[in-house]
């Protein structure tokens, strides 16, 4: 296991859930269910309300692989929209192009999806894009660059991930033509997040 995998392993142990949605981290949690530095049935330290909010914020940050600045800006954008700020926050993060590439099974992880986008493999509405943080809207369409080796890679990824995750109801995927279409912005019940987004809203609201 390399250094990056070890770091991710410590994160899932700290949070107690597999935020990366990959089987290898389920195995780590099963083998070592306690946070790093704790052994057996050692008593957990009492966590303050701020501490709880910070943990939930970190879960979302590491789940989507965004920086502190990106998450802060996403929260500010979510506040501008009508509706529940926490729901808006998750909806915006879900509609990042790297996340959609991941959700569709075109990549085995969000980190891998970011690489795919950054390398110019993705065509959005007929134009090549290289920015993983682009937010998609209803009717936006994703295709793969016309190159046999790239399409072979994506089809291999789809095959590897097909049994590991459920396809979201808010996107439409054509596995034969390697197309993705955004049907609509996801509602809260269409987002399988593993964090309490309301605590994240409270975290940022106190620092506004």
From Swiss-Prot:
Residue ranges of every copy of the S4 RNA-binding domain listed in the record: 95-157
Keywords per UniProt: Ribonucleoprotein, Ribosomal protein, RNA-binding, rRNA-binding
UniProt-listed CDD domains: S4
Stored SUPFAM superfamilies: Alpha-L RNA-binding motif (SSF55174)
GO CC list: small ribosomal subunit
One annotated GO molecular function: rRNA binding
Recorded superkingdom: Bacteria
Gene Ontology biological process terms, A to Z: ribosomal small subunit biogenesis; translation
Entry's family note: Belongs to the universal ribosomal protein uS4 family.
Function statement: One of the primary rRNA binding proteins, it binds directly to 16S rRNA where it nucleates assembly of the body of the 30S subunit. With S5 and S12 plays an important role in translational accuracy.
Subunit structure: Part of the 30S ribosomal subunit. Contacts protein S5. The interaction surface between S4 and S5 is involved in control of translational fidelity.
Protein name per UniProt: Small ribosomal subunit protein uS4
Species whose genome carries this gene: Borrelia garinii subsp. bavariensis (strain ATCC BAA-2496 / DSM 23469 / PBi)
């Amino acid at each position: 296991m390399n250094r990056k995998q070890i770091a991710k392993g410590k994160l899932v142990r700290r949070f107690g859930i597999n935020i990366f949605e990959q089987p290898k981290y389920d195995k780590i949690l099963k083998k070592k269910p306690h946070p790093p530095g704790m052994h057996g049935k050692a008593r957990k330290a009492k966590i303050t309300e701020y501490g709880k909010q910070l943990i939930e914020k970190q879960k979302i940050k590491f789940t989507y692989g965004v920086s502190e600045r990106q998450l802060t800006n996403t929260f500010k954008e979510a506040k501008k929209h009508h509706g529940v700020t926490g729901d808006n926050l998750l909806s915006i993060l879900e509609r990042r192009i790297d996340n959609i590439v991941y959700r569709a099974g075109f990549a085995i992880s969000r980190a891998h999806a970011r690489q795919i986008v950054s390398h110019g493999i993705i065509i959005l509405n007929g134009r090549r894009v290289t920015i993983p943080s682009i937010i998609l809207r209803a009717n936006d369409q994703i295709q793969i660059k016309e190159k046999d080796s790239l399409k072979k890679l994506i089809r291999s990824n789809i095959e590897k991930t097909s049994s590991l995750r459920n396809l979201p109801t808010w996107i439409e995927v054509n596995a034969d033509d390697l197309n993705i279409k955004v049907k609509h912005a996801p509602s809260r019940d269409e987002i399988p997040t593993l964090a309490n987004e309301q605590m994240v809203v409270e975290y940022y609201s106190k620092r506004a």
